[in-house]
Amino acid sequence: MACPWKFLFRVKSYQGDLKEEKDINNNVEKTPGAIPSPTTQDDPKSHKHQNGFPQFLTGTAQNVPESLDKLHVTPSTRPQHVRIKNWGNGEIFHDTLHHKATSDISCKSKLCMGSIMNSKSLTRGPRDKPTPVEELLPQAIEFINQYYGSFKEAKIEEHLARLEAVTKEIETTGTYQLTLDELIFATKMAWRNAPRCIGRIQWSNLQVFDARSCSTASEMFQHICRHILYATNSGNIRSAITVFPQRSDGKHDFRIWNSQLIRYAGYQMPDGTIRGDPATLEFTQLCIDLGWKPRYGRFDVLPLVLQAHGQDPEVFEIPPDLVLEVTMEHPKYEWFQELGLKWYALPAVANMLLEVGGLEFPACPFNGWYMGTEIGVRDFCDTQRYNILEEVGRRMGLETHTLASLWKDRAVTEINAAVLHSFQKQNVTIMDHHTASESFMKHMQNEYRARGGCPADWIWLVPPVSGSITPVFHQEMLNYVLSPFYYYQIEPWKTHIWQDEKLRPRRREIRFTVLVKAVFFASVLMRKVMASRVRATVLFATETGKSEALARDLAALFSYAFNTKVVCMEQYKANTLEEEQLLLVVTSTFGNGDCPSNGQTLKKSLFMMKELGHTFRYAVFGLGSSMYPQFCAFAHDIDQKLSHLGASQLAPTGEGDELSGQEDAFRSWAVQTFRAACETFDVRSKHCIQIPKRYTSNATWEPEQYKLTQSPESLDLNKALSSIHAKNVFTMRLKSLQNLQSEKSSRTTLLVQLTFEGSRGPSYLPGEHLGIFPGNQTALVQGILERVVDCSSPDQTVCLEVLDESGSYWVKDKRLPPCSLRQALTYFLDITTPPTQLQLHKLARFATEETHRQRLEALCQPSEYNDWKFSNNPTFLEVLEEFPSLRVPAAFLLSQLPILKPRYYSISSSQDHTPSEVHLTVAVVTYRTRDGQGPLHHGVCSTWINNLKPEDPVPCFVRSVSGFQLPEDPSQPCILIGPGTGIAPFRSFWQQRLHDSQHRGLKGGRMTLVFGCRHPEEDHLYQEEMQEMVRKGVLFQVHTGYSRLPGKPKVYVQDILQKELADEVFSVLHGEQGHLYVCGDVRMARDVATTLKKLVAAKLNLSEEQVEDYFFQLKSQKRYHEDIFGAVFSYGAKKGNTLEEPKGTRL
């Protein structure tokens, strides 16, 4: 056969100079005082006599191209390029190398398969005959051209001679053999071409071991041991590859059946659990079937399963002294070592195939070194692997029950930090994912400069954590296949033809037809079971997503006995109520007793229904805040409407108070409702249904599961509050307090002036809120401390520890940072909100008198509890006083009392007008329970503020309120409605308008203020300031309603709207597209809304439904704004009592 010269100059490459890369691969032998040479490599033959391994050829040949990365055949014409952009820095690459791609990837014109793990285009299967000569020859010549094209200086004669020799060898034998130099070149170029490898910057520093003369499995084992010894290098990892004989006819392959040279076993235990690495279950069982003796540990190194010359595989145990393992520990958490984790130091891929010049090498194990996330994120945290994430999260004290706490992110970061720390401490080579990403970006720049492209698989190269923080995230990439290349292979045990049937592993596979029949039969049975079950529909309406989460939780519980489905109210048709058997509703209450926006449509349809043709059972759970008088109003409205329609209530309507034990209340109600449903519908085997532990684990409090330990460290107050509430807490100082009410008034409303520490604090806008973290009253705290049974040192810093679910170790409870019991009761825990029913149930165990215990148990019933709660509104101290036999431990208080929440106040100043200050308008709250006959109670925050002295610190943070700000267009007219302390945000409005007028020359539109109070000589807040704003033209008009003028009828803000401002309101809202703002308590807001709707309905002749839609549109357009607060009490003092609770006051 003549040499096909037409192939000679097919390969074209591109010029480019590359800077010499630092050898961090440890392949270079470093003599002290000598300058390392980049071409010097460690010769493994030097280990021959020490280890007794056979001699074999290594990559130290002298005829390797001087610079593999300088391919410099200049093209005569510039190929068409693809533009690649880095969206992080704007850098542009032009890829021309993709024209040399040798095969199509899996993606199609209408289908992207980039995220498929092992696509067909990247996988080579077995062969049953040699590669045809007509296929082999062009590929061989293509590779020879590529090899000789990589030299700095052309070697024409040698190039032509080699082409001639290869051609004749193929013609004579049907195949050809690579020289050592060509093999070294091929292995390195295959690494260079690997699109899924992030560490390719080291591609030229690969040590090549030539084991092509190997003939038996025993020899393979010795070569692999040599590889492991060299590459491990006592922890100073060196990248290496061992190449075994090439494929001939496909029937005499050399294969390594392991996916990695070193990997841990995974065992399926009798109880169904998995011990070890779940990813290796199948291969571990294969090893056992082949005669390996399992040890059933978590980290057992699997044996090598080696196939030589197509023979049946043989099993070889790796000598333990060859396997370097790293024990995991954390730089901060001592308990991390208790997890008993470790990992092997050498990541050596063993099951890939090297393709080069038409030749295939199905056994070519190679290694680099680890990137930390491969172990810390994938091996340890993947759910299908060791899956330690939640255990670490619990030990860290994170809120693993809620995704919004970001516990997964925090835990995986610490696990990754532990891996890096452990490897570095034991001097084992590892690279963090940020450094790896940076190195790849450098490699990519080099490649585009050197050869006009760099194949890269973005999905694989972006690390599994940090995302856009790494530079590779922002880099566009092209993915294509070049030759030489490393391909995936089909697992050998799936295609191997066994010669000794005795060695064949026991077949466990189920035939496909049998499997299909089994699945079909099971699905039929399940359909029958589900069809026979009672249908349960779970409806939800939500603004924040909380109700939906609880609805799905409820459906999961009911799915143990019912055929459940979850539906949002906006997707539910009211006429389908006729088909229901069991209806469960979970909904929040929004605004002034309204339903959430996604429940509006169903509410209208439901409340227009007159009767049901078919009745059903139902139960309702409402979420809300007891600060508002319309607490869970929408849930109760649904309950009443369904009852009136004839449906039967399955369980009393549940209430979840966001201020007190909402989750506990839901779990208790869910279990109660589930059991009632099982009884009502006579569910088969209802007594055998095991309710999930998470619904019942909080029902009791076991002292032996908690303990207090002394802690030498404690956080300062701001850091502690930031940790507890996940807020950016800063300190302000009290400048002054001024009582805005006159001496004639028995009440107190404060103008609170706070100053920033430092030159300037966080920015804020008019209408936004300041959240303040108050302290509980000293008398309440001391009273509780005196009744705690194990509190000898209330000022000693302690840490609460909780016994893990397994009962094997203690973990720190991160709900509270280390603190003293006094500090916790003062600043961190809510001791004024009445205990929940569940808390009373837990308290009952500490009562030493039986009558007290029985009474506490009785209060766990909803009717008893509600009467007791709303009559007494007891603080925790009053509960201890009512039941004096209670002996409560400190751990109970730290673990069970609710967190003291911040109090929000509308900011009453403009930052432009008073740059270094924040002003608040605060009503000081005092009231008596039991119709004025009970003990005197004080608002937590208002009382705390009233007792502050100048320069006292105030921990706080700014909360943005995007829906309650001045119009973007200052020319739009506004109506501001705010009686009492509802005036607070409007003071910031007029200060901002004053500043804009004086310093920016901006003239605002009409701003009409409607204010309300009792008497002009008692509580007309900011009266003189309002008058000044009118004189300066900032306020257009001020209208005031007085409700306590002697001899005159009570006038409220809604009366002014109806009698004096009807035309102005209609003009602003309808004619001029202006804005209306309402700030105050919910009752006032409801009355104002009712008045406005009547006014607009009369002006436009609208029906009730039409006017509701009109105001819904106003809110959607963000022209009707409400800032509503609650804390209006049904247990207020009798009329005339000087301690009567002011409406709408924040506590």
UniProtKB/Swiss-Prot annotation:
Entry binding sites for (6R)-L-erythro-5,6,7,8-tetrahydrobiopterin: S115, R378, I459, W460, F473
Chain intervals for the UniProt region annotation (Disordered): 22-51
Pfam families noted in UniProt: FAD_binding_1, Flavodoxin_1, NAD_binding_1, NO_synthase
UniProt domain FAD-binding FR-type: residue ranges: 727-967
PTM remark: Polyubiquitinated; mediated by SPSB1, SPSB2 and SPSB4, leading to proteasomal degradation.
Cellular compartments annotated: Cytoplasm, Cytosol
Binding residues annotated for FMN, in chain numbering: T542, E543, T544, K546, S547, S588, T589, S625, C632, E658, Q662
Protein EC: 1.14.13.39
Factors inducing expression: By interferon gamma and lipopolysaccharides (LPS).
Residues reported in the UniProt entry to bind FAD: H769, R903, Y905, S906, T921, A923, Y927, V940, C941, S942
Protein name (database record): Nitric oxide synthase, inducible
Source organism of the structure: Rattus norvegicus (Rat)
The encoding gene: Nos2
